[in-house]
Every structure is written in structure tokens, then in C-alpha cells.
Amino acid sequence: MMNYMDLLLTQAGKLPQKVFLVTETKRLTYEAVCDAALSYAALLQSLSCPKGTLLIVRKDPVAQLTAFLGAQKAGFVPILGHPDLTPLLAETLSKKRGIAYIDDGQFRVGQSGSMVPQGAIMGVLSSGSTDLPKLLFRTYESWADFFPEQCRIFGLKRDSVAFTEGSMSFTGNLSVFASVLYAGASLVMGEGLYPKRWETLLYREGVTYLYLVPVKLKLFLRIIRHPFLSVTTVMAGSQ
């Protein structure tokens, strides 16, 4: 059963030294991201616990993604939680949604019971703010089958540089990451609501593909001082 760690292993074999993930302070190649994910997978495997759903809570987007990928390699079904999820809320979410394990810096047993659909390789949490997030499952094919057409329509290819801002627990950002991985492209990730710093990152990295939710895109458009000649695609979508 194919998953995104399998895809990363393939891309890292083809493009080991190509820059994959970028933040203000980090530049990681495909090989480096793969190595970090394999290290996390080895840590999970050393625990010798039954496989199941795993709620992952990290503040840093690179750490979110390497744990997400490593969990898949280790045979778990990863679920990225919001970075501000407190231990108490994580445990409540685990109990209400039947998530088997929690790793928010401390790995611990959660609440078993959630039935994982056949073929599911990850869980995603709904972004509704009125209640506890719902847990939805995704197969690899549910996204990956659309990547060839998405990449064609939006011009996402190996030399593309995409930009997102915010947590990878948001489905929109995670989907962009997955598309970038499929294309063998690069992903620049802004951290925090600092549009002037996003502007610096876009110029510095020569971003070609911009993805922001509408409210953040409007905020960004208010502060930009120069045209971005490198940007060919702008996407405004939901998180």
C-alpha cells in the first residue's frame, strides 16, 4: 500500500541533494528530510507497540512533516494536530475520536477504538471551530490520483518553488506539500502571521506558486512593495 513516505523515498533516490523544505532558518534536501523521517520511524519501531492511529503535535512545520512521514514508514496512521493543542485537549481528542496514541513531545497511549478504513494512510482533522474536530481518513489515492492533472493545471513541476503559511495540520497546506513532493519541487513555509517576512522569503527563494487562505492573501497584498516576477500561480483556498 503506497504512502507519502514511499513517495519521498523514491524522490530522495532521484533528487537527493535537491532542496525540498525551506523556512526562514532551515534548508533541507530531499535526502535530509528522508533521513529525519527514517530516524523518527526507527524511534517508533523501537517502542514495539501495536500499530494504530497516532496524533502528532509539533509547532515547527518541518518537524510536523518528518514525524508524519516517519509514522507512515513505521506502519502507523498519522494525524497532524494543531500546534497549539494542549496535552489535555490532545487527550480529550484521543478519547472522543478513538486515537490510539499521542506524541506531543511525550509519546503515550491514547484511546483505542477508532476503526481505520481499509487503505487509509493518514487521518485529517476538520477545521471547524464550533466543536471538537472530526477525524476523517484518507487513502493515498484520494489525493495522489489527482496530482498529475493538478500539476498540469497549476504549472507545478520539478523546478517550481511553492509557498504556504501555517500549520501542516491544515488540510490545504498538507495537500500542497503532497503535490510538491509528487512533482519533486521545493516548498517554502512561512511561520506566523508576519506578511513582511513572507515577502522576504518569496523574494529570497524565487517562489513560483503561492498558496494562502483568502484572508491572509488580502493581508499580504496590502504590504507587498514590488511585483513578484517569479510568481506564475496564486491559489487562495481553505485550510
Please describe what each predicted stretch is.
Residues 26, 42-84, 165-167:
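Conserved AMP-binding/adenylate-forming
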Residues 29-30, 120-148:
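Conserved AMP-binding A3 loop
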Residues 58-59, 79-93, 185-205, 214-216:
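ATP-dependent adenylate-forming carboxylate-activation enzymes
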Residues 102-120, 137, 145-147, 153:
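Flexible, low-complexity linker/hinge segments
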